[in-house]
């Protein structure tokens, strides 16, 4: 039976400049930080936090990013978790919603470990096995920047192939991970500039994955290492989701594609709004106009942050659609 953990307090994401944060090195036997972003889903968050007992021996800290929840997450969190509370738990609160991307970046800056496991608040660990397998890949192969996991139900049964990072049935190289649960090499993510905060949520993992690929890194999918994704619909709005998906797809092209490709692809990506709206049965009056206005407002930021990837990176991105088998380097 564990003693009651200390719940650390942290202030707004804007309080401490990242440049002055120099975390002390962690114990070598605890190489993992777990980061969870949450907003207005306390019960779901509690379930996810309780599942972290599976990786407690590996974990240096658990950092919860409270993304402007109407009722702050921190008060009473330890009491609600009881003896299931992670021993080294901290809560970082942003008073206004900033988005998952900002939360993950803050977690990466706060962490002091080589590996960071990001979980959605509705993701649940079923055992330590998936995380241990992912850490083993990162430890053995310095070219790997991220490990993708398959989605499962609470019994460990895999969701359909279309809901996975790949249809592969063996360890494979893939384009991207799914944000619900992914393990990253912290230094690689920070060196790439982290998540694009302008995207907030939806498509942010694919955008980061492309930049990691452009930097020479690889992403490995482990199809036999499931993590449960008990997707919660709380707080979800179909029209807003449609807005985010289309806007972010266009923004990612504007930020990352070579100019000739962006000129051709941006109108196509923008026009996808209409078949998506019909296919989803969304009643979204004025939705297309909102997307266009949001893109216009983002143009100054796009001009500042735009950094096109290489054509060779885009060719490799297309090749990775086939999910070629992953062969780890020979052990020294």
PLM feature segments, named:
Residues 66-77, 124:
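A conserved acidic beta->alpha catalytic loop
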Residues 50-59:
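Short, acidic, metal-binding catalytic loop of nucleotide-sugar glycosyltransferases
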Residues 116:
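Short aromatic/hydrophobic "clamp" motif used to bind/position activated sugar donors
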Residues 94-111:
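Glycine-rich, basic loop-to-helix element that forms the pyrophosphate-binding segment
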């Amino acid at each position: 039976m564990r003693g009651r953990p200390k719940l650390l307090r942290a202030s707004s994401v804007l309080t401490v400049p990242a440049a002055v944060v120099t975390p002390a090195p962690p114990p070598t036997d605890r190489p993992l930080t777990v980061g969870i972003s949450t907003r207005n889903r306390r019960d779901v968050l509690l379930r996810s936090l309780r599942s972290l007992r599976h990786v407690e021996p590996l974990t240096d800290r658990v950092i919860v990013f409270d993304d402007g929840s109407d009722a702050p997450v921190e008060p009473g969190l330890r009491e609600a978790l009881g003896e299931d509370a992670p021993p080294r738990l901290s809560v970082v609160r942003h008073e206004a919603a900033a988005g998952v991307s900002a939360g993950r970046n803050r977690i990466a800056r706060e962490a002091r470990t080589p590996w960071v496991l990001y979980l959605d608040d509705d993701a649940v660990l079923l055992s330590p096995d998936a995380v241990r397998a992912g850490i083993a890949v990162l430890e053995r192969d310095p070219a790997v920047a991220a490990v993708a996991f398959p989605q499962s139900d609470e019994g460990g049964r895999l969701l359909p192939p279309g809901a996975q990072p790949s249809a592969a049935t063996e360890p494979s190289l893939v384009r991207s991970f799914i944000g619900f649960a992914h393990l990253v090499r912290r230094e690689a993510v920070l060196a790439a500039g982290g998540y694009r905060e302008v995207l907030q949520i939806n498509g942010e993992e694919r955008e980061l994955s492309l930049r990691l690929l452009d930097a020479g890194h690889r992403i490995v999918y482990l199809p036999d290492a499931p993590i449960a994704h008990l997707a919660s619909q709380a707080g979800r709005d179909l029209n807003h989701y449609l807005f985010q998906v289309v806007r972010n797809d266009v923004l990612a092209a504007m930020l990352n594609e070579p100019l000739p490709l962006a000129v051709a692809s941006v109108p196509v990506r923008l026009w996808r709004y209409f078949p998506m709206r019909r296919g989803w049965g969304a009643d979204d009056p004025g939705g297309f106009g909102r997307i266009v206005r949001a893109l216009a407002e983002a143009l100054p930021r796009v001009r500042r942050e735009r950094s096109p990837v290489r054509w060779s990176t885009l060719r490799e991105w297309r090749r990775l659609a086939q999910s070629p088998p992953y062969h780890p380097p020979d052990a020294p």
